[in-house]
Amino acid sequence: MRQKTATITRRDKSFTGHYVPVKPTPIKDPEYVAHSKNLFSELGFADSMAESADFVRMFSGDMSGVPVPMRQVGWASGYALSIYGTEYTQQCPFQTGNGYGDGRAISVLETLIKGQRWEMQLKGGGRTPYCRGADGRAVLRSSIREFLAQDHMHALGVPTSRSLSLYVSKTETVKRPWYSQGSRSENPDMLISEAVAISTRVAPSFIRVGQLELFARRSRSNEHPKAMEELEKIVLHLIDREYADVIDTQLATPEKIVLLAREFRGRLTSMVANWIRVGFCQGNFNSDNCAAGGFTLDYGPFGFCDVFNPYYQPWTGGGNHFSFMNQPNAAQRNFDMFCSALRPLLVSHQQDLLAFDEIQSEFLAVMDTKMKAMWATKLGLINLKTESDKALCNVLIKELQTLMMQAPVDYTIFFRELSSIPDDIGPLKKSFYSNLYNDAADDPDTLALEKYWIEWLEKWQMLLNSTCDAKGISSRASEDIAMQMKLVNPKYVLREWFVMPAYQQATAGDYSLIQELQAVMTQPYAEQSKELEDKYYRLKPLEFFEVGGLSHLSCSS
């Protein structure tokens, strides 16, 4: 929906409109790096298109030659910012919150392909009115991370924006703060020149919770006569783009909003449960990084767990509120801001407002149910028959989380090894970072911990038996459960220490490691070759712990 435009300058104090026309700034001398073969196939594109002159030109930011009826200009959108449920305006150049928005993301195309609507957005396409003094560029390093991550998350079965293509400039660079080799500094300790790149991401829309907040805030403060109308339009546009298949267009607007809240709650809770399932931490889950369509958006300082740690946080500025196991609570704060933004449209519809408030109040209960179901699925306990078995499953989950921290264990490797339903704890040792069973075999604490692991495994095996017939778990049943577990517990995840060599090689024009990672990470549940297993299914080397750019990241991109 682009019914309104807005022109923003440093002097403006109030604004209207849903978008701003922006012409991308092409990168100089673009070179092909990668494209998503899976998405190209879905769209009916030939792989050869990714390196064709017209395609490269457009998706490296040059829209001067686009065919009719396309326009030679894209658009950027404004949004508000809330961090963990608190509204912020401090970094806005106007101190009003009206200066936030797509600082380097420019949408260039909206199209209908095979019945599916897609919006295509350049990331790193140059300055927009929302860049707050920045250059509007993205560097190759961060572009590779996001490109690979979106492809990987889709293959993992996690709702996400999609990667389309990635191009790098052979001659244009910008300076960014980053870490020196082997640095253990919390924040970047040097300034480096990096090649600029443009990646294109694709989704049905890029409407964020923060975008709804922006129009709600304008309505709340009566910034202009059509503020409430613009809020309603952006909400109806969201429904049209993301929820048209589940919300009847003939319903009255208040009824649509109640259904929207219910549907978004379902998508948001499922998405976050999936994040935990695969070990993903978004790192910076502000409302402006929360897609109102209920999918993963904005791969900045994200990371995948190596060692299981509830407080794992890849971003040095993220704090515990965006840490791995607190993501359900962060999601609840974003849902609260979502509801707060929609509520003004219901103030004169009390029955709808009551239903709406009930949906909001039940968020954590729904989230808890999704989380328990997710853990049970990871443990292969999907057919529990009695309430006592379900209660025991919840106890096992809590005990396991404690044991995983005490060992400690590699999150991905542990659950993948457990998926083979081992008879004893031997195979699980592959996931242990502590050398418990060698150097300290006679240590009382080690022996006690080993005893707890054995007891836990026995209780888990007994509960698995209860999901089968009275004769216990058969060989065939065991194989079926193992197969099901291996479909939810990935063997391969995109660890930061896999990605760093890829973007380091890419700076020298060698993209082969990107292609290898793309091939492996788009088949995360497959066994793959012994060579790839030895390379990508292993514990994080000790020398990589606490290293900047490997264990922790800044927002530099």
From Swiss-Prot:
Enzyme class: transferase
One Pfam family this sequence matches: SelO
Source domain of life: Bacteria
Catalyzed reactions: L-seryl-[protein] + ATP = 3-O-(5'-adenylyl)-L-seryl-[protein] + diphosphate; L-threonyl-[protein] + ATP = 3-O-(5'-adenylyl)-L-threonyl-[protein] + diphosphate; L-tyrosyl-[protein] + ATP = O-(5'-adenylyl)-L-tyrosyl-[protein] + diphosphate; L-histidyl-[protein] + UTP = N(tele)-(5'-uridylyl)-L-histidyl-[protein] + diphosphate
Binding-site positions, ATP: 101, 103-104, 123, 135-136, 201, 208, 298
Active site: 288 (proton acceptor)
Family (UniProt): Belongs to the SELO family.
Protein name per Swiss-Prot or TrEMBL: Protein nucleotidyltransferase YdiU
Organism: Moritella marina (Vibrio marinus)
